[in-house]
Amino acid sequence: MTSPDRAFDGWLPGVVRRPSPHFNERPEGALVSLAVLHFISLPAGRFGGEDVDALFMGTLDAMNRPEYESLRGLRVSSHFFVRRTGEVRQYVSVLDRAWHAGVSSFEGHTGCNDFSVGIELEGTGETPYEDAQYLACLLYTSPS
């Protein structure tokens, strides 16, 4: 990949911008060369709520929700969240490192967060994705 255009701030036009506090700078010289797709729904199997947004924004009320006990204190984010409607929310500039891949490796390179963009699709991994989600992924991951 080529070096990013410094006039570009890493926030894509046409998406809902929701800056997360859960990110940091990529290592110097790191270039994005990977898109990591995940699925997420909160509560599990329920779509359309605001809990995924709250998780990435650090405002999820895990103390008063027993089903979220395992998420208590978790600091995670993704660059993008694609809702079932096709709406795309962006939490972290693509120039920065979102915290989505955890301990990871790809083709012998460790720390995938350093060189990837994280895309969360609203889903369960068992429920088919919506056409609008596929279209949104194509629009925002295809080279221009």
How does the language model describe each region?
Residues 140-144:
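Conserved small/polar residues in nucleotide/adenosyl-binding loops
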Residues 2-26, 34, 41-139:
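Active-site-adjacent loop/helix surface patches within enzyme catalytic domains
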